Amino acid sequence: MPRKGNVQKREVLPDPIYNSKLVTRLINHMMMDGKRGTSTKIIYGAFDIIKNETGNDPVETFEEAMKNIMPVLEVKARRVGGSNYQVPIEVRPDRRTTLGLRWLVQYSRLRGEHTMVERLAREIMDAANNTGAAVKKREDTHRMADANRAFAHYRW
C-alpha cells in the first residue's frame, strides 16, 4: 500500500475483434507466463465454437454467463473476542467481475474435454444456462453468506 495517495487503476483496452473490455480481461486472466497470443487463440477459438453450436453472438453468451457466475455476497473472516466469525459482506462491482473471471478460468481448466478451447467453450455455455462448476461455486458462496447471516452485524 502506497504512503502517498491511491494507486491509479490502469484502464484495459477493448480487444480488437469483439471490441469488449470484458473479453480483454478474460484474455488476461487466461494468460499464463505472459503468453498473450496463446491465451487469445484459446478465447477466440472458444467463441467460434459457441457461435457455431448456439448460433448466438458469443460475446452476449459470455456476458450472460458472467452475469450468472458473478457473486453478490461473500463471507470474510472477522475476529471478535477470540473467535473467528464468517461475516457476510457485499462484493464490490470490480471484485465481482474479477471473481467471476477467475472462477470461469479455474473451473474451465478442471473440465475433462480434450482441448482448453473446448473446455472454455463448454464452461461458458453451461454458465449461460445456469449450470456448470463456476455457477455452483457462486451458489456455494451465496449459501455460505446466507448461513452466516446472523453475524452480519459484525460488518465493518
Swiss-Prot record:
Name of the molecule in the record: Small ribosomal subunit protein uS7
Family: Belongs to the universal ribosomal protein uS7 family.
Pfam family, one: Ribosomal_S7
UniProt subunit comment: Part of the 30S ribosomal subunit. Contacts proteins S9 and S11.
SUPFAM superfamilies reported in the protein's UniProt record: Ribosomal protein S7
Keyword annotations of the record: Ribonucleoprotein, Ribosomal protein, RNA-binding, rRNA-binding, tRNA-binding
Cellular component aspect of the GO annotation: small ribosomal subunit
Claim: Amino-acid biosynthesis is one of the keywords in the record: no
InterPro entries named among the record's database cross-references: Ribosomal_uS7, Ribosomal_uS7_bac/org-type, Ribosomal_uS7_CS, Ribosomal_uS7_dom, Ribosomal_uS7_dom_sf
Protein's UniProt keywords contain Ribosomal protein: yes
Job of this protein: One of the primary rRNA binding proteins, it binds directly to 16S rRNA where it nucleates assembly of the head domain of the 30S subunit. Is located at the subunit interface close to the decoding center, probably blocks exit of the E-site tRNA.
NCBIfam families: rpsG_bact (TIGR01029)
